[in-house]
């Protein structure tokens, strides 16, 4: 199974004396393949293209997501690559104010709050089949000091996530 998806955002902003075209396009695909009756391989890739400049003067392509993993019995999954940080599990349930605010979720590649590189993620649904509705996630990100800018560096990172999605049959 392979899904192709995309988005085009035509945007222009006028703030504090600035006048900027912020148009972009996103293109991605996600896929999965059945390896055997219990094991499924999956992956996703998504890129963003700057469409706000004249041809030949764009700032380039940004890789937003690029990861691959294995899912065992739809209860346990493990993946590695550029993916959402484990702290984004909170942001996925709330309004992170993507245009005006939500600054704590905007620092990509640090703090495991947004898209980030080099993360190994283990997730289980129904706590390995023991408790219906209880999910657990654990994530590790290796140190990255390859950029000379210290605001783009980070040490080893760990994060954990716990969720329960059926409080009193509410679906929450």
Language-model segments: residues:
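Outer-membrane beta-barrel pore domains
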Residues: 167-172
């Amino acid at each position: 199974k392979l899904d192709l998806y995309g988005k085009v955002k035509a945007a222009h902003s006028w703030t504090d004396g600035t006048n900027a075209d912020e148009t972009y396009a996103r293109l991605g695909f996600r896929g999965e393949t059945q390896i055997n009756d219990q094991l499924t391989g999956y992956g996703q890739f998504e890129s963003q293209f700057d469409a706000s400049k004249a041809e030949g003067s764009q700032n380039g392509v940004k890789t937003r997501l690029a990861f691959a993993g294995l899912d065992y019995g739809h209860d346990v999954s493990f993946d590695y690559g550029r993916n959402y940080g484990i702290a984004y599990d909170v942001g996925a349930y709330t309004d992170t104010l993507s245009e005006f605010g939500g600054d704590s979720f905007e620092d990509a590649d640090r703090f495991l709050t947004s898209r980030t590189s080099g993360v190994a993620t283990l997730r289980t649904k129904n706590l390995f089949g023991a408790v219906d509705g209880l999910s657990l996630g654990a994530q590790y990100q290796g140190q990255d000091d390859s950029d000379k800018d210290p605001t783009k560096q980070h040490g080893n990172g760990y994060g954990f996530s716990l969720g329960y999605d059926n409080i009193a049959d509410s679906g929450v």
